[in-house]
Protein backbone atom coordinates (compact mmCIF):
# COMPACT_ATOMS: atom_id res chain seq x y z
CA UNK A 1 0.00 0.00 0.00
CA UNK A 2 3.00 2.33 0.28
CA UNK A 3 3.05 2.96 -3.47
CA UNK A 4 -0.71 3.63 -3.52
CA UNK A 5 -0.46 6.04 -0.60
CA UNK A 6 1.96 8.20 -2.58
CA UNK A 7 0.02 8.46 -5.85
CA UNK A 8 -0.73 12.14 -6.38
CA UNK A 9 -4.38 12.64 -7.34
CA UNK A 10 -7.30 14.92 -6.68
CA UNK A 11 -9.78 12.42 -8.14
CA UNK A 12 -11.13 9.12 -6.90
CA UNK A 13 -9.31 6.16 -8.50
CA UNK A 14 -10.74 2.64 -8.81
CA UNK A 15 -8.13 -0.02 -9.58
CA UNK A 16 -9.81 -3.13 -10.95
CA UNK A 17 -8.11 -6.56 -10.77
CA UNK A 18 -6.96 -6.44 -14.41
CA UNK A 19 -5.05 -3.25 -13.51
CA UNK A 20 -3.47 -4.51 -10.27
CA UNK A 21 -0.14 -5.30 -11.91
CA UNK A 22 0.10 -1.73 -13.26
CA UNK A 23 0.01 -0.45 -9.68
CA UNK A 24 2.24 -3.13 -8.15
CA UNK A 25 -0.68 -4.82 -6.36
CA UNK A 26 -0.07 -8.54 -5.81
CA UNK A 27 -3.64 -9.52 -4.87
CA UNK A 28 -5.26 -10.83 -8.07
CA UNK A 29 -5.46 -14.50 -7.07
CA UNK A 30 -6.78 -13.59 -3.62
CA UNK A 31 -9.40 -11.29 -5.17
CA UNK A 32 -10.46 -14.12 -7.49
CA UNK A 33 -10.75 -16.53 -4.53
CA UNK A 34 -12.78 -14.03 -2.49
CA UNK A 35 -15.14 -13.34 -5.41
CA UNK A 36 -15.53 -17.07 -6.08
CA UNK A 37 -16.43 -17.70 -2.42
CA UNK A 38 -18.90 -14.80 -2.39
CA UNK A 39 -20.51 -15.99 -5.61
CA UNK A 40 -20.85 -19.58 -4.39
CA UNK A 41 -22.49 -18.33 -1.18
CA UNK A 42 -24.86 -15.69 -2.60
CA UNK A 43 -27.98 -17.27 -1.11
CA UNK A 44 -26.45 -17.64 2.37
CA UNK A 45 -25.17 -14.06 2.29
CA UNK A 46 -28.39 -12.45 1.07
CA UNK A 47 -30.52 -14.50 3.49
CA UNK A 48 -28.75 -12.67 6.36
CA UNK A 49 -30.32 -9.40 5.18
CA UNK A 50 -34.14 -9.62 5.14
CA UNK A 51 -34.68 -6.60 2.86
CA UNK A 52 -31.87 -7.35 0.41
CA UNK A 53 -32.55 -6.55 -3.26
CA UNK A 54 -32.09 -9.44 -5.65
CA UNK A 55 -31.62 -9.88 -9.39
CA UNK A 56 -31.71 -13.02 -11.51
CA UNK A 57 -28.15 -12.62 -12.83
CA UNK A 58 -25.58 -11.49 -10.27
CA UNK A 59 -21.88 -10.75 -10.40
CA UNK A 60 -19.17 -9.31 -8.18
CA UNK A 61 -17.43 -5.98 -8.73
CA UNK A 62 -14.03 -5.83 -7.02
CA UNK A 63 -11.58 -2.96 -6.87
CA UNK A 64 -9.05 -1.12 -4.77
CA UNK A 65 -10.14 2.47 -4.23
CA UNK A 66 -7.82 5.43 -3.74
CA UNK A 67 -9.59 8.40 -2.20
CA UNK A 68 -7.52 11.59 -2.45
CA UNK A 69 -6.37 13.43 0.69
CA UNK A 70 -7.99 16.51 2.15
CA UNK A 71 -10.11 18.36 1.03
CA UNK A 72 -11.71 15.56 -1.09
CA UNK A 73 -15.17 14.40 0.02
CA UNK A 74 -17.43 11.94 -1.76
CA UNK A 75 -20.93 13.38 -1.46
CA UNK A 76 -23.77 11.87 0.57
CA UNK A 77 -25.39 9.25 -1.66
CA UNK A 78 -27.39 6.05 -1.54
CA UNK A 79 -26.01 2.82 -2.92
CA UNK A 80 -26.55 2.29 -6.64
CA UNK A 81 -29.79 0.41 -7.30
CA UNK A 82 -27.88 -2.35 -9.14
CA UNK A 83 -25.91 -3.21 -5.97
CA UNK A 84 -27.44 -5.66 -3.49
CA UNK A 85 -24.51 -6.08 -1.03
CA UNK A 86 -21.57 -3.77 -0.37
CA UNK A 87 -18.30 -4.39 1.45
CA UNK A 88 -15.54 -1.86 2.15
CA UNK A 89 -12.32 -3.05 3.81
CA UNK A 90 -10.24 -0.24 5.26
CA UNK A 91 -6.56 -0.68 4.31
CA UNK A 92 -4.47 2.46 4.79
CA UNK A 93 -3.51 4.83 6.44
CA UNK A 94 -3.55 3.90 10.12
CA UNK A 95 -6.01 6.70 10.98
CA UNK A 96 -8.75 8.19 8.81
CA UNK A 97 -12.48 8.71 8.42
CA UNK A 98 -14.63 5.59 8.06
CA UNK A 99 -18.02 5.54 6.35
CA UNK A 100 -20.48 8.18 7.53
CA UNK A 101 -24.15 7.19 7.65
CA UNK A 102 -27.18 9.47 7.36
CA UNK A 103 -30.99 9.24 7.38
CA UNK A 104 -31.27 11.66 4.44
CA UNK A 105 -29.06 13.33 1.85
CA UNK A 106 -27.82 16.19 4.05
CA UNK A 107 -25.15 16.76 6.71
CA UNK A 108 -27.79 17.45 9.40
CA UNK A 109 -29.07 13.88 9.02
CA UNK A 110 -25.76 12.36 10.25
CA UNK A 111 -26.34 9.30 12.45
CA UNK A 112 -23.07 7.43 12.92
CA UNK A 113 -19.67 6.68 11.47
CA UNK A 114 -18.36 3.17 10.85
CA UNK A 115 -14.99 3.69 12.48
CA UNK A 116 -11.84 3.50 10.37
CA UNK A 117 -9.78 0.58 11.64
CA UNK A 118 -7.24 -0.85 9.18
CA UNK A 119 -8.05 -4.42 8.11
CA UNK A 120 -11.68 -4.10 9.26
CA UNK A 121 -14.68 -4.30 6.96
CA UNK A 122 -17.97 -2.39 6.78
CA UNK A 123 -20.78 -4.36 5.09
CA UNK A 124 -24.31 -3.31 4.25
CA UNK A 125 -27.18 -3.93 1.84
CA UNK A 126 -28.37 -0.76 0.15
CA UNK A 127 -32.01 0.18 0.56
CA UNK A 128 -33.42 3.03 -1.49
CA UNK A 129 -34.06 6.10 0.64
CA UNK A 130 -32.50 4.48 3.75
CA UNK A 131 -28.79 3.82 3.33
CA UNK A 132 -27.39 7.31 2.75
CA UNK A 133 -23.64 7.43 3.28
CA UNK A 134 -20.47 9.33 2.42
CA UNK A 135 -16.73 9.01 2.78
CA UNK A 136 -13.71 11.25 2.75
CA UNK A 137 -10.13 11.51 3.91
CA UNK A 138 -9.15 13.63 6.89
CA UNK A 139 -5.46 13.03 6.34
CA UNK A 140 -2.79 14.40 4.04
CA UNK A 141 -2.40 10.95 2.46
CA UNK A 142 -4.63 8.82 0.25
CA UNK A 143 -7.38 6.69 1.81
CA UNK A 144 -7.04 3.11 0.49
CA UNK A 145 -9.90 0.59 0.59
CA UNK A 146 -10.67 -2.81 -0.95
CA UNK A 147 -14.27 -2.84 -2.20
CA UNK A 148 -16.57 -5.67 -3.17
CA UNK A 149 -20.11 -5.33 -4.49
CA UNK A 150 -22.55 -8.11 -5.27
CA UNK A 151 -24.64 -6.57 -8.01
CA UNK A 152 -26.79 -7.08 -11.07
CA UNK A 153 -24.44 -8.67 -13.59
CA UNK A 154 -23.03 -6.23 -16.13
CA UNK A 155 -20.01 -7.44 -18.10
CA UNK A 156 -18.25 -4.05 -17.99
CA UNK A 157 -18.75 -3.65 -14.23
CA UNK A 158 -18.36 -7.16 -12.83
CA UNK A 159 -15.03 -8.89 -12.33
CA UNK A 160 -16.69 -12.20 -11.45
CA UNK A 161 -17.86 -14.54 -12.83
CA UNK A 162 -15.06 -14.40 -15.38
Model feature map: region roles:
Residues 32, 36, 40, 85, ...:
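A structural signal for well-ordered alpha-helical segments within the folded catalytic domains
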Residues 44-53, 105-113:
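A broad, low-specificity signal for short, low-complexity segments enriched in glycine/proline
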Residues 66, 89-91, 139:
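Short, low-complexity Ser/Thr-rich regulatory SLiMs
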Residues 47-85, 98:
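Non-heme Fe(II) oxygenase catalytic core, chiefly the N-lobe of the double-stranded beta-helix
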Residues 72, 81-83, 93-162:
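Catalytic core of Fe(II)/2-oxoglutarate
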Residues 1-51:
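Non-heme Fe(II)/2-oxoglutarate
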Amino acid sequence: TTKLAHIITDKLIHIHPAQYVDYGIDFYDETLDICDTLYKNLKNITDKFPECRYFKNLGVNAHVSITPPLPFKFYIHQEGLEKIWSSVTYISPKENVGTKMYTAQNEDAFVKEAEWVPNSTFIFCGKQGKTWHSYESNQLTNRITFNLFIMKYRSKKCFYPL
